[in-house]
């Protein structure tokens, strides 16, 4: 039973590797290049008479959601299963064949990752494809081809799986997208008023009650109309990085700032990215939003239809 959890003899093995990434070295946020990589090996990996020598296994990559970490999916959970325990049960019940499951760490100072390349965050797609996959194929007995390699994830991880299936079908044979970010007009746009309020707390000088006029011809307005930070985003980030605990509003604001850095990076802009809304008036900036929509899976299906057809499996 769930309440009396005991280690299972057929639960497989968890291995944690530490590796230093060349691709994440000197990333713009100063996030660590040294990363932990969780790997779950099924019971069958070591169980047969030759200690599994020679037998190779397919590999699944677990892309975690925003604010998540790969290793956390291996944590002990009372009254529930972690991902490794669930996989062990599914293999034991013959609902799934034995496979190696990999838990990459793609966490960033902006609270998470969409598993794509961004000049404002780092090249996390390259990190996965050019470093993590070859490392796993080198260290473990894998079936080292796209036909035996898949990725799955929820939320940001679902987005990552979808985009990887679209853009990088040479590396992946199947993808599973659980509640991945899509239809940006619907999911992101309505969330920005809260974010503009949170960022407004870091406006200098602070906003006072009373009549307020935004002068459309001012220098400040010109910069804000281009989605450039007037300092409040920088102050917001510096404040968030010092806090022990974020409020729900701050957490959502951090997420939206992370999405701006993901979808509209600009090395020449303050902080390395632009914002999709005018931070004083709250007006959507159509030129900036166009850049976001270039990353919306709903609008990319036709462009990447040939790659999607190459996949053996797509779960949405």
Question: Which stretches of residues belong to each language-model region?
Answer:
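Non-catalytic cap/lid and distal C-terminal segments of serine-dependent acyl enzymes
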Residues: 1-315
């Amino acid at each position: 039973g769930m309440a009396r959890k005991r280690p299972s003899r057929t639960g497989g093995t968890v291995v944690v590797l530490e590796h230093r990434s060349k691709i994440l070295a000197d990333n713009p946020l100063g996030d660590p290049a040294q990363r932990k990589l969780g790997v779950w090996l099924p019971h069958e990996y070591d169980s047969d008479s030759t200690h599994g020598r020679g037998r190779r296994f397919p590999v699944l990559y677990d892309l975690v959601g925003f604010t998540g970490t790969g290793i956390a999916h291996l944590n002990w959970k009372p009254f529930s299963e972690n991902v490794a325990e669930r996989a062990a049960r599914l293999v034991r019940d013959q609902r799934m064949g034995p496979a190696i499951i990999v838990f990459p760490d793609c966490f960033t100072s902006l609270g998470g990752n969409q598993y794509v390349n961004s000049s404002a965050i780092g090249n996390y797609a390259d990190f996965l494809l050019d470093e993590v996959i070859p490392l796993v194929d080198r260290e473990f007995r894998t079936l080292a081809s796209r036909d035996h390699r898949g990725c799955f994830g929820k939320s940001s991880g679902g987005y990552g799986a979808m985009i990887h299936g679209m853009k990088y079908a040479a590396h992946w044979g199947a993808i599973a997208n659980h509640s991945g970010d899509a239809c940006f007009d619907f999911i992101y746009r309505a969330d920005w008023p809260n974010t503009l309020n949170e960022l407004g707390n870091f406006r200098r000088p602070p906003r006072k009650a009373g009549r307020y006029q935004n002068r459309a011809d001012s220098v400040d307005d010109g910069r804000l109309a281009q989605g450039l930070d007037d300092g409040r985003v920088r102050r917001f980030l510096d404040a968030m990085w010092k806090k022990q605990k974020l409020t729900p509003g701050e957490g959502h604001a951090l997420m939206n700032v992370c999405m701006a850095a993901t979808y509209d990076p600009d090395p020449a802009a303050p902080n390395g990215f632009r914002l999709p809304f005018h931070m004083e008036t709250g007006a959507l900036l159509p030129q900036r939003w166009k850049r976001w929509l270039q990353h919306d899976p709903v609008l990319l299906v036709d462009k990447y239809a040939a790659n999607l057809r190459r996949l053996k499996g797509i779960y949405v």
